[in-house]
Amino acid sequence: MVPELDAYRLAGYASIAGVTTVAAALSDGKAALAALRAARGKIENAEANLATCYLFINPTIYGMIEDLDTTASKKAIEGFAGIVKVPEGRFYSKIDLNASGEGGFKKNAAGKAINFLIVDKQTAIQYQKHTVSKIISPDVNQDADAWKFGYRTVGIVEAYDNKKDGIYVHTAGE
């Protein structure tokens, strides 16, 4: 819905203590395919159901895998409940939200770019505790002769302690 919300949720899952996190540079499609195969193996060996797992992936990495043009690359991507391509501008392991209503976010100094993230929906605890939307018509908008939409939300991004093996994070290497 909003880039900040996407970035917050993805960084939240990536920074949960106890989830599998691997950092490595992926220079080509073969390296990306090997990393994705290793992640799938880890998830499946942890007895997570791949059919309930979502793959969040950087479009560049996804393209490198697709460009291999082999059955192996297609098989590595099959079987997930869904595949979501996430722009690199909102795909970090840690972020800082801008304060005082100015909106937006930036990568935390300790944050790394995420290559891909696998999340089992049976592992994730995600819901909005409080959501407020406000629509201001042009008649009462004092800033401009236009509609104004305000959106404020507070949510939870956590994982069940006994199912943290259902989350796998692959970040860019140093």
Residues of each region from the PLM?
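Sequence/fold signature of self-assembling virion shell proteins
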Residues: 67-174
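Long, contiguous amphipathic alpha-helices that act as assembly "spine/axial" helices in icosahedral shell
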Residues: 1-20, 46-48, 55-56, 138, ...
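Extended amphipathic alpha-helical segments with heptad-repeat/coiled-coil character used for oligomerization
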Residues: 42-60, 66
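Alpha-helical scaffold segments that mediate packing/assembly in large oligomeric complexes
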Residues: 1-46, 169-174
